């Protein structure tokens, strides 16, 4: 037990830690633009835009081609496989467009969920086969971090011991493989907001899941300084009749994290989990204003909560590009402020930013 076979060299560790720190530098968070083709279909349907490869490229070009000052708010962008090999309107590959702004490029590497037989509809996540080779290729193609999402749910029987153990182990195995290939793993154990559970129930489940995840990461010799965590905020279920304030959400979330996430982890980038754009910003802001000691950066890794207003403004029309970009930049700046606890809402939130983005049993 005393001897150790070092998983990573000193140089490898240094590279991973540097990448992780760059992504969560003060005031910076992550733009999750890794929606699958199927998920983009749902997004586009709402604005009556056909889900073609060109339309997907066009919308992402709009996000990635905003002014370079976006790098003050966005430290990393997560891409979907298709997007990694697409080009901007000017014919430049997207990873280069993003890197030239000083932003780190990431890639979603999981292959979606699969049912766990004998459980109440719980899942594990697929994609470990061939992952090492894919990571090596992605690193060559300009990526420096990766994302893998595991999904858990809350009900009378969930999350079960099997569901927790299996997903924790899969996340740890993924994280280890990423680090061997020079990619910083974003570890994402998402507890879905579906259900009528209250804040306390979500906090309890979140603590149990995160404790298991960090035990598994330790068992697999994962270098924590070269990882990031992407958890759910502790919120009540969408069908819960009691509504909680951002302060209550912040207290429950930070308490759960303080109990389970080692101080060696450089940053925690929350998923927005179907909250409205404004709600996601207010909750993050409240966390960063708490007097509780927080050893890690608390930031964002938002998809819908950074893109909803931009999508509504765009409507698939080139003429709306500027308005759409402005909407995206505005949200990015607000979340940058929230990640420092400096967001002061004006009370002027637009309709698109206050609309719930909840989708039942959400799949990317």
Curated annotation (Swiss-Prot):
Stretches assigned to coiled coil: none
Protein location: Cytoplasm, Cytoskeleton, Microtubule organizing center, Centrosome, Centriolar satellite
Highest rank taxon of the organism: Eukaryota
GO molecular function, one term: fructose-bisphosphate aldolase activity
Keyword terms of this UniProt record: Cytoplasm, Cytoskeleton, Glycolysis, Lyase, Schiff base
Family matches, as CDD domains: FBP_aldolase_I_a (cd00948)
Binding site for substrate: 56, 147
Similarity annotation: Belongs to the class I fructose-bisphosphate aldolase family.
Name the record gives this protein: Fructose-bisphosphate aldolase B
Lineage: Eukaryota, Metazoa, Chordata, Craniata, Vertebrata
